[in-house]
Amino acid sequence: MKYSMTMKALLLFLLIIMNIVSGCGGQQSADKSKLQVAASFYPMAEFVQAVGGKNVQVTTLVPDGAEPHDWEPSPKDLTRLGRAQVFVYNGLVEPWAEQALEALSERKIIPVEAGRALFTRGGKQDPHVWVSPKKAIVEVQRITEALCEADAKHVDEYKANSRAYIAKLEQLDKQLTEVAQKAPKKVFVTAHAAFGHLAEDYGLRQLSVAGISAEAEPTPGDLQRLIITVKREKVRYVFFETLTDPKIAKLVAQETGAQTAVLDPLEGLDEEGRKQGLNYLKIMEQNIANLQKALNE
């Protein structure tokens, strides 16, 4: 997604607003005893909170239920970012991030591109690194380094929290490794190609209805080829996700006799999910259970 004069106008407006906010005590809602961290979208926010614990106040820019690939910051969102001491973002999902940081350069915000150098797979750039526990561990380690840099007083707590959370990610890694190794099938089908890193890291093969972007629409030819492949591979489940329209995934399932199930790319958590007490770890456990079922039938 390329930004036009609209984005530039927003950034200019942001600078004006930030000057007004600075002179009017606009940060009163922030707890000054805590490190102020802005996170681009849900998984980044959860990783920050897991490491930061009681010593951080996390602002998530992309709201609950929104698709982060489609989301663009408003002037209000950019103002919220301008109040942060640390900004954690994945990379590639947030094409607006670099321009926003450049406009806010005088704020001395510490930027953390948690997914940097992890994106390439199969010669392509794929941002969905957080859905692989192996790469999520790397992201958490980078977030830990940034929090320690920004807040030296609580380094020991950040490192202890990080070790505890990474131990839980390592347990997910172990579970997924066992599922993938023991499964008679190695192919699974998803609504969009959000699980390529997971597939690559665990010796599986992802087939997708749409491309890496959730916005991508498959052509009739793409659909026909996928339907043929699903029948040939005897795939019993077509996975869809919670934040996008499942109609195409359901069409493929209908044409092939497969069932549908959820494989959540963890791009966001809606209000219902929060009410249920869901989080990254619990949703990944559900994903692993659903994958296990699909790969063994």
Walk through the language-model features, giving the residues of each:
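Bacterial N-terminal signal peptides that target proteins for export
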Residues: 2-11
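Extracytoplasmic metal-acquisition and chelation regions
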Residues: 19-297
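Bacterial N-terminal signal peptides
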Residues: 10-20
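General N-terminal leader/first-domain-start detector
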Residues: 1-2, 22
